[in-house]
């Protein structure tokens, strides 16, 4: 696997080694030994999968305190713009974000350390999105930043009139209100 730095400490893009032939392809989506060597130790405890359609924006979500989560995210089918925002207090890159095209074709993954908000927009007709997390989901520790925070000014690459949000995601505070 190839690890690509993003300019934000700990937030990396992972390109797996894909083996393909006339039958299709194969790649390791996670190998604990290699991940530990190239990125650092992590113990994933929960896998999640979602299916969404074009225009959906999910996020920007995080968990607080002892329930903070690191995530390894990827797309099985379709395409997203995946976004991680550094919320680590004292970080020299606090409030900075990185966006990456993750697709079922490029097989790229993003490793998002604890202390980041995460979200994505669906750019294809449909997407199947998977992620591993190193801590269990805890509803009472949920936090979020508004997807359209003007300070962050994230271009989700979807016209605002076509954005589809959950009721919950419509009402998150801006970063400065945290």
Question: Which residue ranges define each predicted feature?
Answer:
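Active-site micro-motifs of SAM-dependent methyltransferase domains
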Residues: 118
């Amino acid at each position: 696997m190839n690890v690509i730095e993003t300019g934000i400490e700990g937030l990396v893009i992972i390109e797996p080694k894909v083996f393909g032939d006339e039958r299709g392809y194969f790649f390791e989506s996670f190998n604990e030994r290699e991940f530990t060597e190239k990125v650092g130790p992590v113990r994933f405890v929960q896998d999640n999968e979602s299916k969404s359609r074009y225009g959906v924006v999910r996020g920007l979500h995080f968990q607080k305190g002892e329930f903070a989560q690191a995530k390894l995210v990827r797309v099985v089918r379709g395409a997203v713009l995946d976004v991680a925002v550094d919320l680590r207090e004292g970080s020299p890159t606090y409030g900075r974000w990185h966006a990456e095209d993750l697709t079922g074709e490029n097989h790229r993954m993003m490793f998002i350390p604890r202390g980041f908000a995460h979200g994505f927009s669906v750019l294809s007709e449909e997407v199947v999105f998977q992620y591993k997390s190193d801590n269990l989901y805890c509803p009472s520790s949920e936090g979020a930043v508004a997807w359209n925070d003007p300070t962050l000014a994230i271009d989700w690459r979807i016209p605002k009139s076509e954005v589809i949000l959950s009721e919950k995601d419509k009402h998150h505070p801006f970063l400065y209100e945290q």
